[in-house]
Amino acid sequence: MNIYTNNVNNANVCNNANRGFVRALILLVAAAATIGTAYGGVPLNNLQGTGGIAFNPLAYTAGRPWEGGETNILNGIVSKPQVGGWYVNLTDADINWFALGAAFTVADRLEISGGYAGINAHNYGDNSLNTYNIGAKLRFLDENAFETSWVPALAVGGVFKYTDSETVDALGLRHHGADGYVVASKLVKETPIPVLLSVGGLVSDEVVYGVVGHNRYGAAVFANIDIIPFEQIALGFEYKQGVRVGDGITNHDYFDGHVAWFVNKQLTLVGAYAYTGDKDRFYRDGHTDRLGVGGGFVLSLQYQF
């Protein structure tokens, strides 16, 4: 396979899609700014659909309660759904990545999520790469449990993942895999500015976030920190350690800095810059350690019903 195949037509399609996405985002921002005075928040639907930020899950479960409180029979049984869309433009590698996710929570404890991503990596010979995810997360300890102000929310979860791509076969990897994780999250309100802290451990077989396939299992850690200087704004940093997945393959650490605007109680907009490692490390040097796909800008639109 020629890993540096250029496809001008696909590049033009991506450019048109990029412009359409930005136009739609501007229209939604303008419309949302005219309604609502209450503000949404985390968790968002991350790139795999799980309730979290961008790469990482949070211990909080997705979905708002229904109106009517205890008089609504759905409350305590199933939450409202929430959805999120992502556009990732990894300019270093000329990769365009669109992701959609949805999630809801059962019995105020068990989050069920799903996600899809379509990725165009035409410079690497793969114009149509698709990933599919199904996740579940159980929050087994509530934030501030035992009448305290310091206990974090704790959750365990997993994501089953499938990658549909010729690249998987070309690299001798598996199409399917799974993640398992445990995560603790805490909103600290005693500081001058509220701070959201989250840290967790991950077991995964992913190669480049599962985008190019799956191999053997390894362990890693992840963390998030966000400050909330204004009721409608959060500024944060996200870290995800690269997993060693056998056969000399190690993923690069992932980083992103982001800003979230809670437009109203339903709509949240996110802008970020993400870095995933040297895009040419394997193709230039033949190394399979610290694999990445470069860096670029990220936009997200999240909606909580």
Regions found by a protein language model. Give the residues of each.
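Solvent-exposed loop segments that connect transmembrane elements
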Residues: 247, 280-292
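Short acidic, glycine/proline-rich loop/turn micro-motifs
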Residues: 167-168, 210-211, 282-284
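Transmembrane beta-barrel domains of Gram-negative outer membranes and organellar outer membranes
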Residues: 40-191, 203-207, 229-233, 243-245, ...
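Low-complexity, intrinsically disordered short segments enriched for Gly/Pro and polybasic residues
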Residues: 1, 8, 152, 195-199
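Cleavable N-terminal export/targeting peptides
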Residues: 1-54
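A mid-sequence, solvent-exposed acidic-amphipathic segment
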Residues: 196-244
